[in-house]
Curated annotation (Swiss-Prot):
The keyword Repressor does not apply. It comes from the Bacteria. This is Prodigiosin synthesizing transferase PigC. The gene is pigC. GO terms for molecular function: ATP binding; kinase activity; ligase activity; transferase activity. It is an enzyme of class 6 (ligase). Keywords: Antibiotic biosynthesis, ATP-binding, Ligase, Nucleotide-binding. Pathway: Antibiotic biosynthesis; prodigiosin biosynthesis. It comes from Serratia sp. (strain ATCC 39006) (Prodigiosinella confusarubida).
Length: 890
C-alpha cells in the first residue's frame, strides 16, 4: 500500500522518519506522547521525490549545478494531484488560516545532527497559492549551497519533507532549555520569554525575561524581569513587525507562575521522549502552552570554568597577574558586544592598534597579544601591557600612576607586580625617550594640519563612498574597497591616538592642580573644566535643532511629523510630495555629515543613523513638541563657568593661577582636536558595515547566510571570503554562526563581569535582579556639579525608548555615548551605572550645565521610571523616593 504524499501529523507511530523528515518526526513524537502541539500536516519526502523526478532532468541532479536545480524546482508546476492534496490539507487546518511552512530534512532536528536553520521556514503564510509557492521554496532550499554542504557531510538522502502547521498567534512566546546554557547544569530548566510572537526572541530583536527553574521540583530558582519596550506581532497586512509594548505591560513578567509550571512539566516530558537535552520553542495563547519545536542540543554548554581575559596568553605568570580594565576604554566598545563586534575588535587589535599607538611616541609597540582582552562578550584594555609599553615615555614612566586610574575599589594592588616586566632600562630607555621627544615635536608641529586633513579625508571619502554602487561591484572590487578602508582606518586611528592620550594626560594634570589649589571648592573644579572644547557631539544636537527649525517653517511638513510615528516617517518622508525636498535636501546634508554615527560603533551589527534614521526622527518629534534653546543653555553654562573661575583664580597665587589657566587652555585645545578627528575613523567603520551587508545580501540569494546573521559573523572569516582565500560555506558555516549565536546567548544569561580584574574570572549566572525598595540612596562618582529634584526615566534601549523621555526628567542609563547627546538637551540630570571622569556622560553633562553622577553600578536595577530622585552632582549621591512610597504617602 502506497504511503499518502500528504499526511496529518497525528502521533501515529506508523509515520516514519524517512517520510516526515526530522522536524516532522519530532512533532509526531510529541503528539504521540500527548503533548500540546498545534495542528499540522506533512508534505512527505516521497512527495518531494515524486515531484523532483517529474520536473528536474536526471542530468541536472547529478552534475552539481545547484542554482539550475533550485531554479527548476521554483518554476515548475506542481502535479495536479499533489497540488490538490496540499490544498486540502491547508483548508483542513482552517479556512484561509495563517500557517507556518517549515522544511523538514531527513536529518534535521534528528538525534545524530541538528540542521536547524539550514533549510527554509516561512511564517504567517496565508492563501492556497502562497502555501504552494512556499512548499516549492522549501524543496528548493535542499539545494542551497549551505544545505548541500551539510547534506554531503552527513551522507543523508537527497529528500526533504515540508510541514504545514497552524500559527499560534501568541500572547507570549520564547525558547526553553532543559539544561543551563551557561553552566551546562542539567538539573535546571532555563526559559527566555517575551510578549507576542517568538520571532523576536530567536532573532534577538526584543528584550526577554529569563526564568530558571529546578527541573525536578519546578521551584523558581531565579528570574530576570526586564523592561520590554517592544514585541513582535502581525500587522494588519499579516506581516511580522516590531511594535511598542503597552506601557502597563513593559515591566510585568511575560509568564505567570502557572504558565511556568506548565512549561517545566512539558520540558521534563519532552526530555523523556528524546532521552537527551533539548531546546524547545513554545508559545502561550489564552493561557494554554503550545510546543512548536523541539531540538536536541548539539552545542555543548560550557561549564563555568575559570577564563582569562587574554585567550592567547601562554605564560602562566601573565595569565594570573595581568590587570585588565574596561574603565575609560571609550564608548565605542562599552557594554556587551555581539560576536561580530568582538571579532572586529580583535581585527583592530591585530592590525590597527599597534601602528596607531606608535604615533604617540612609542619606539617599541610590543606584540598585539598584550593590547586588549575579552571576558563574556565585554572588551577590556590590558592595563598591565599598556603600562609596560608606556614606561618608554617620560610622562608615564611611573606605571602605577597610569595603572591605578583604571582600577575599581575592588582591586588590591598590595602585591601587584607587572607580569610583563620592568620595561626598558638604561641606554634603551634613553633611546626611547629621544624617540618620544621627537614624536611629540612632530605631533605639535603637525597637529593643526592633521586635524584639517582628517576632516577633509572624512568628507571626501564619505562623498566618494556614497557614490559607489556596491551591488554592481565584483567580489574582487569589494575586496579592493575593503583594503582602501583598512588604509584610511589605520591613518585616522593613528591621527586620533596622540590627541586621545594627551587629553587624558592633561585632564589628569588639571585634576591634580585643582585638588592642590582649590581646597574648598566643592564640585567647582568640575565646572571650570567645562566648556573647554567644541564637542562634535554638541554639533550633532545643534544640527538636529537646525532641522527642526526648518520643519517648523513648513506647516504641512510639521503636520506630517506630528501625525506620524518616527518609524512611519522613515518610509513616508522620502516619497511624500510635502517632505521629499526636505528629505533629499536638508536631511540628506545632515546624514552626509553625521549619518555614520550610532551606538557602540565598533559593533558593526548595530545600524548607524543613515541605516536607520528613526531615532533622529524621534528626537526631532520631541524637539518639535518641546523646543530647545541650546545656544542659551550653553551661554548660561559658560557664564557660570567664567564666574566660578574668576572667583577661584582671585584667591590663588600667581603661579597657581598661571598653571591652572595654562592647563585649561591646553586641555581644551587637545580635547577639541580629539573630537574633530574621532569621526573619521568612525566613518570608516560604517564603510565596513555597508560592504558586509552587501555581501550578506548576495549570500542570502544563494541560501548561505542573510543579514539576520550579521551579529554572529566572524569579521576576519568574512574578510578571508571576500579576499578569495576561503569559500563562503566555510566563512559563514551554519555551525560557526550557531556557535556564535549560542555564545551570545550564554553572555546574555551570564552575570556581567567586573569592570576591572586581575587574573582569572569564573562566569556566573545572573544574580536575581535587585528590587529592594529599602534602598533609598546610591553613591557614585560626582561627574558634573549641581543639584536637582526630578522624576527618573530609566532607558536601557535608546533606539526603542527615546520617545518615552520627557523634558526635565533625570535620565538613568547603563552608560551613554554620542548618540545619547540629543536627550541631554532635555534632561534635568544624568545618572549612569558605568562612567568615569572622561566618559561621554560626564563631559556632555558639564557642557550642558546639568548635574551628573556616574559609576553607580546598579542604578538601572534599583531606580524605576517615575521614582523621584534628589541628584547631587557635587557629592555624587542620588537619593531615591520610590513611586510606590509617594503614592502611599499621597
Amino acid at each position: 500500500m502506497n504511503q499518502p504524499l500528504v499526511v496529518e501529523i497525528s502521533g501515529d507511530k506508523a509515520l516514519e522518519h524517512h517520510h516526515l523528515g526530522g522536524k516532522g518526526y519530532s512533532l509526531n513524537n510529541l503528539i504521540h506522547a500527548g503533548l500540546p502541539v498545534p495542528s499540522a500536516f506533512c508534505v512527505t519526502a516521497q512527495a518531494y521525490q515524486q515531484f523532483i523526478e517529474e520536473v528536474v532532468p536526471g542530468a541536472e541532479l547529478t552534475d552539481g549545478d545547484l542554482i539550475a536545480v533550485r531554479d527548476a524546482i521554483l518554476h515548475a508546476d506542481i502535479p495536479d494531484s499533489l497540488k490538490q492534496a496540499i490544498g486540502d490539507a491547508y483548508q483542513h487546518l482552517g479556512h484561509d488560516t495563517t500557517i507556518a511552512v517549515r522544511s523538514s530534512a531527513l536529518d534535521e532536528d534528528g538525534q545524530r545532527q541538528s540542521f536547524a536553520g539550514q533549510y527554509e521556514t516561512y511564517l504567517h503564510v496565508k492563501g492556497s497559492e502562497a502555501v504552494l509557492h512556499k512548499v516549492q521554496a522549501c524543496w528548493a532550499s535542499l539545494w542551497a549551497e549551505r544545505a548541500a554542504q551539510y547534506r554531503h557531510e552527513s551522507a543523508s538522502h537527497s529528500a526533504i519533507a515540508v510541514i504545514l502547521q497552524v500559527m499560534v498567534d501568541a500572547d507570549a512566546a520564547g525558547v526553553m532549555f532543559t539544561q543551563d546554557p551557561l553552566s551546562g547544569s542539567t538539573d535546571k530548566v532555563v526559559i527566555d520569554s517575551c510578549w507576542g510572537l517568538g520571532e523576536g526572541v530567536v532573532s534577538g530583536q526584543v528584550t526577554t525575561d529569563s526564568f530558571t527553574l529546578d527541573k525536578a521540583t519546578g521551584e523558581l530558582c531565579d528570574q530576570q524581569i526586564r523592561h520590554k519596550p517592544n514585541y513582535c506581532q502581525r500587522d494588519e497586512h499579516g506581516l511580522v513587525t516590531l511594535l511598542q509594548t503597552p506601557e502597563a505591560k513593559r515591566d510585568l513578567p511575560s509568564l505567570t507562575p502557572a504558565q511556568l509550571q506548565q512549561l517545566v512539566t512539558l520540558a521534563r516530558q519532552a526530555q523523556l521522549i528524546y532521552s537527551t537535552e533539548l531546546d524547545i520553542e513554545w508559545a502561550v495563547k489564552d493561557d494554554k502552552v503550545w510546543l512548536l519545536q523541539a531540538r536536541p542540543v548539539t552545542t555543548s554548554a560550557k561549564t563555568a570554568n575559570v577564563i582569562y581575559a587574554n585567550p592567547w596568553e601562554s605564560d602562566p605568570a601573565a595569565k594570573e597577574g595581568a590587570f585588565f580594565s574596561r574603565m575609560d576604554t571609550g564608548e565605542i566598545v562599552t557594554g556587551l558586544m555581539t560576536p561580530l563586534g568582538l571579532s572586529f575588535c580583535q581585527f583592530y587589535q591585530k592590525h590597527i592598534h599597534g601602528p596607531a599607538i606608535k604615533t604617540m611616541g612609542l619606539a617599541d609597540i610590543s606584540h598585539w597579544q598584550i593590547y586588549m582582552g575579552y571576558i563574556q562578550g565585554y572588551v577590556y584594555l590590558n592595563i598591565s601591557g599598556s603600562a609596560y609599553m608606556l614606561r618608554q615615555c617620560p610622562p608615564t614612566r611611573n606605571e602605577m600612576k597610569f595603572t591605578t586610574r583604571y582600577a575599581t575599589d575592588e582591586i588590591d594592588f598590595k602585591d601587584y607586580k607587572n607580569p610583563y616586566g620592568a620595561g626598558v632600562q638604561g641606554w634603551d630607555y634613553a633611546k626611547s625617550c629621544w624617540y618620544w621627544l621627537k614624536q611629540q615635536v612632530r605631533n605639535m608641529r603637525s597637529a593643526a594640519r592633521t586635524v584639517e586633513q582628517m576632516i577633509a579625508l572624512r568628507q571626501d571619502e564619505t562623498t566618494r563612498f556614497l557614490g559607489l554602487d556596491l551591488t554592481a561591484m565584483t567580489l574582487q572590487q569589494l575586496d579592493q574597497e575593503l583594503q582602501r578602508i583598512d588604509r584610511f582606518f589605520l591613518d585616522s586611528c593613528a591621527a586620533y591616538m596622540p590627541f586621545f592620550l594627551q587629553s587624558f594626560a592633561l585632564y589628569d594634570a588639571l585634576a591634580q592642580a585643582c585638588e592642590r589649589h582649590i581646597k574648598d571648592g566643592k564640585g567647582l573644579q568640575n565646572r571650570i573644566k567645562a566648556s573647554m572644547n567644541n564637542l562634535r557631539t554638541i554639533e550633532v544636537t545643534l544640527g538636529i535643532i537646525k532641522l527642526v527649525a526648518t520643519v517648523n517653517q513648513q506647516t504641512e511638513l510639521k503636520a506630517l511629523f506630528e501625525q506620524h510615528r518616527a518609524d512611519e516617517l522613515v518610509t513616508l518622508l522620502p516619497v511624500h510630495d510635502i517632505s521629499r525636498a526636505f528629505w533629499q535636501g536638508d536631511f540628506e546634508d545632515f546624514l552626509v555629515e553625521f549619518g555614520s554615527r550610532g551606538r557602540q560603533e565598533f559593533d558593526l551589527s548595530i545600524p548607524r543613523w543613515r541605516d536607520d534614521p528613526s531615532y533622529l526622527l524621534q528626537v526631532m518629534k520631541m524637539y518639535l513638541q518641546h523646543p530647545v534653546d541650546l545656544h542659551k543653555k550653553l551661554r548660561e553654562t559658560e557664564l557660570l563657568r567664567q564666574q566660578d573661575s574668576e572667583a577661584l583664580f582671585s584667591a590663588m597665587s600667581w603661579s597657581g593661577r598661571f598653571k591652572l589657566k595654562t592647563l585649561i587652555k591646553l586641555y581644551g585645545m587637545m580635547a577639541e582636536r580629539r573630537e574633530a578627528t574621532r569621526p573619521t575613523f568612525i566613518t570608516e567603520t560604517w564603510f565596513y558595515r555597508c560592504i558586509m551587508l552587501e555581501v550578506l545580501r548576495r549570500l542570502d540569494a544563494q541560501g548561505i547566510a542573510s543579514s539576520a546573521d550579521l551579529p554572529y559573523v566572524d569579521f576576519e572569516q568574512f574578510r578571508a571570503y571576500v579576499a578569495g582565500t576561503i569559500p563562503a560555506e566555510q566563512a559563514f558555516s551554519k555551525a560557526r554562526l550557531d556557535q556564535n549565536r549560542h555564545q551570545h546567548l550564554f553572555n546574555l544569561h551570564a552575570e556581567e563581569p567586573p569592570m576591572a580584574i586581575v587574573g582569572p574570572y569564573t562566569p556566573k549566572v545572573k544574580a536575581p535582579t535587585q528590587d529592594d525598595k529599602t534602598i533609598r540612596s546610591l553613591t557614585g562618582l560626582a561627574a558634573s556639579p549641581g543639584n536637582v529634584v526630578a522624576k527618573a526615566r530609566v532607558i536601557t534601549d535608546l533606539q526603542v525608548q527615546a520617545g518615552e523621555f520627557q523634558p526635565d526628567e533625570i535620565l538613568v542609563a547603563r552608560f551613554t555615548d554620542a548618540s545619547w547627546t540629543p536627550l541631554f538637551a532635555l534632561a534635568a540630570g544624568i545618572v549612569t551605572d558605568i562612567g568615569s571622569t572622561l566618559s561621554h556622560s560626564c563631559i556632555v553633562a558639564r557642557e550642558f550645565g546639568i548635574p551628573a553622577v556616574v559609576n553607580l553600578k546598579t542604578a538601572t536595577q534599583i531606580i524605576n521610571s517615575g521614582d523621584m530622585l534628589i541628584l547631587d552632582g557635587d557629592s555624587g549621591t542620588v537619593i531615591i523616593q520610590h513611586q510606590e512610597e509617594r503614592n502611599h504617602d499621597g
